[in-house]
Protein backbone atom coordinates (compact mmCIF):
# COMPACT_ATOMS: atom_id res chain seq x y z
CA UNK A 1 0.00 0.00 0.00
CA UNK A 2 1.20 3.45 -0.95
CA UNK A 3 -0.25 6.94 -0.56
CA UNK A 4 0.11 8.93 -3.80
CA UNK A 5 -0.24 12.72 -3.68
CA UNK A 6 -1.07 15.02 -6.58
CA UNK A 7 1.36 17.43 -4.94
CA UNK A 8 1.34 20.44 -7.27
CA UNK A 9 -2.14 21.44 -6.10
CA UNK A 10 -2.15 19.89 -2.61
CA UNK A 11 -2.26 22.50 0.19
CA UNK A 12 0.83 22.57 2.41
CA UNK A 13 -1.22 22.00 5.56
CA UNK A 14 -2.52 18.73 4.06
CA UNK A 15 1.01 17.69 3.11
CA UNK A 16 2.03 18.25 6.75
CA UNK A 17 -0.77 15.96 7.92
CA UNK A 18 0.39 13.36 5.39
CA UNK A 19 4.05 13.58 6.50
CA UNK A 20 3.06 12.85 10.10
CA UNK A 21 0.68 10.08 9.04
CA UNK A 22 3.29 8.36 6.86
CA UNK A 23 5.66 8.18 9.83
CA UNK A 24 2.99 6.99 12.25
CA UNK A 25 1.54 4.42 9.84
CA UNK A 26 4.98 3.48 8.48
CA UNK A 27 3.48 3.71 5.02
CA UNK A 28 5.14 4.86 1.79
CA UNK A 29 4.09 8.38 0.78
CA UNK A 30 4.96 9.57 -2.74
CA UNK A 31 4.44 13.21 -3.69
CA UNK A 32 4.25 13.60 -7.46
CA UNK A 33 4.89 17.10 -8.84
CA UNK A 34 6.37 18.94 -11.79
CA UNK A 35 8.56 21.03 -9.49
CA UNK A 36 11.03 20.32 -6.70
CA UNK A 37 9.45 19.78 -3.31
CA UNK A 38 10.96 20.01 0.14
CA UNK A 39 9.93 17.13 2.34
CA UNK A 40 11.09 16.06 5.77
CA UNK A 41 13.77 13.38 5.88
CA UNK A 42 12.06 10.02 6.24
CA UNK A 43 12.44 6.51 4.92
CA UNK A 44 8.69 6.57 4.17
CA UNK A 45 8.46 9.86 2.24
CA UNK A 46 9.75 10.48 -1.27
CA UNK A 47 9.11 12.83 -4.14
CA UNK A 48 8.71 11.98 -7.78
CA UNK A 49 9.38 14.88 -10.12
CA UNK A 50 7.77 14.71 -13.54
CA UNK A 51 8.05 16.95 -16.59
CA UNK A 52 5.87 20.04 -16.70
CA UNK A 53 2.78 19.69 -18.81
CA UNK A 54 -0.94 19.11 -18.76
CA UNK A 55 -1.84 16.03 -16.68
CA UNK A 56 1.74 14.69 -16.62
CA UNK A 57 1.69 14.20 -12.82
CA UNK A 58 -1.84 12.77 -12.97
CA UNK A 59 -0.87 10.28 -15.65
CA UNK A 60 2.16 9.15 -13.63
CA UNK A 61 0.02 8.58 -10.54
CA UNK A 62 -2.48 6.55 -12.58
CA UNK A 63 0.34 4.54 -14.13
CA UNK A 64 1.91 3.65 -10.79
CA UNK A 65 -0.99 3.37 -8.34
CA UNK A 66 -2.38 -0.06 -7.57
CA UNK A 67 -5.42 -1.60 -5.95
CA UNK A 68 -5.32 -0.87 -2.23
CA UNK A 69 -3.36 2.38 -2.61
CA UNK A 70 -4.71 5.81 -1.70
CA UNK A 71 -4.59 8.80 -4.05
CA UNK A 72 -4.86 12.31 -2.59
CA UNK A 73 -6.24 14.71 -5.19
CA UNK A 74 -8.87 17.34 -5.87
CA UNK A 75 -8.74 16.39 -9.56
CA UNK A 76 -11.97 14.52 -10.31
CA UNK A 77 -10.77 12.73 -13.50
CA UNK A 78 -7.61 11.55 -11.68
CA UNK A 79 -9.73 10.27 -8.79
CA UNK A 80 -11.99 8.43 -11.26
CA UNK A 81 -9.03 6.71 -12.94
CA UNK A 82 -7.52 5.74 -9.58
CA UNK A 83 -10.83 4.23 -8.47
CA UNK A 84 -11.03 2.27 -11.74
CA UNK A 85 -7.68 0.70 -10.84
CA UNK A 86 -8.95 -0.27 -7.38
CA UNK A 87 -7.27 2.50 -5.41
CA UNK A 88 -9.11 4.73 -2.96
CA UNK A 89 -9.27 8.48 -3.60
CA UNK A 90 -9.55 11.31 -1.08
CA UNK A 91 -9.62 15.04 -1.67
CA UNK A 92 -7.85 17.59 0.58
CA UNK A 93 -11.18 18.59 2.14
CA UNK A 94 -11.74 15.10 3.47
CA UNK A 95 -14.23 13.89 0.87
CA UNK A 96 -13.69 10.27 -0.07
CA UNK A 97 -14.55 9.58 -3.67
CA UNK A 98 -16.29 6.26 -4.25
CA UNK A 99 -17.44 4.38 -7.34
CA UNK A 100 -20.97 5.48 -6.38
CA UNK A 101 -20.16 9.21 -6.16
CA UNK A 102 -17.45 9.72 -8.76
CA UNK A 103 -19.82 9.73 -11.78
CA UNK A 104 -21.90 12.49 -10.21
CA UNK A 105 -18.75 14.49 -9.48
CA UNK A 106 -17.53 14.06 -13.08
CA UNK A 107 -20.90 15.22 -14.41
CA UNK A 108 -20.87 18.30 -12.15
CA UNK A 109 -17.29 19.10 -13.15
CA UNK A 110 -18.19 18.90 -16.85
CA UNK A 111 -21.24 21.10 -16.27
CA UNK A 112 -19.14 23.74 -14.48
CA UNK A 113 -16.57 23.61 -17.31
CA UNK A 114 -19.38 24.26 -19.80
CA UNK A 115 -20.61 27.24 -17.76
CA UNK A 116 -17.10 28.70 -17.57
CA UNK A 117 -16.58 28.18 -21.31
CA UNK A 118 -19.77 30.15 -21.99
CA UNK A 119 -18.41 33.08 -19.96
CA UNK A 120 -20.30 32.56 -16.71
CA UNK A 121 -18.19 33.27 -13.63
CA UNK A 122 -18.51 30.26 -11.32
CA UNK A 123 -15.94 31.22 -8.68
CA UNK A 124 -13.50 28.89 -7.04
CA UNK A 125 -13.63 26.79 -3.90
CA UNK A 126 -13.50 28.38 -0.47
CA UNK A 127 -10.14 28.35 1.28
CA UNK A 128 -9.35 25.28 3.35
CA UNK A 129 -10.93 25.56 6.81
CA UNK A 130 -10.03 23.96 10.12
CA UNK A 131 -13.07 21.73 9.68
CA UNK A 132 -11.74 20.62 6.25
CA UNK A 133 -8.35 19.75 7.77
CA UNK A 134 -10.02 17.76 10.54
CA UNK A 135 -12.26 15.97 8.03
CA UNK A 136 -9.21 15.09 5.94
CA UNK A 137 -7.28 13.70 8.92
CA UNK A 138 -10.31 11.70 10.09
CA UNK A 139 -10.96 10.21 6.64
CA UNK A 140 -7.27 9.37 6.22
CA UNK A 141 -7.33 7.54 9.56
CA UNK A 142 -10.54 5.73 8.55
CA UNK A 143 -8.96 4.59 5.27
CA UNK A 144 -5.86 3.35 7.10
CA UNK A 145 -7.91 1.35 9.62
CA UNK A 146 -9.96 -0.20 6.79
CA UNK A 147 -6.76 -1.04 4.92
CA UNK A 148 -5.28 -2.69 8.02
CA UNK A 149 -8.40 -4.82 8.51
CA UNK A 150 -8.43 -5.92 4.87
CA UNK A 151 -4.77 -6.95 5.07
CA UNK A 152 -5.66 -9.27 7.92
From Swiss-Prot:
Origin: domain of life: Bacteria
Q: Which InterPro entries match?
A: UPF0178
Q: Which family does it belong to?
A: Belongs to the UPF0178 family.
Full protein name: UPF0178 protein YaiI
Q: Native species of this protein? A: Escherichia coli O127:H6 (strain E2348/69 / EPEC)
Q: What is the lineage of its organism?
A: Bacteria, Pseudomonadati, Pseudomonadota, Gammaproteobacteria, Enterobacterales
Amino acid sequence: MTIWVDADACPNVIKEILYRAAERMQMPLVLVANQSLRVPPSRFIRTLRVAAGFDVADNEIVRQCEAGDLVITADIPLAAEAIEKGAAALNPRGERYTPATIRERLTMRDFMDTLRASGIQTGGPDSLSQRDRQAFAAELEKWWLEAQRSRG
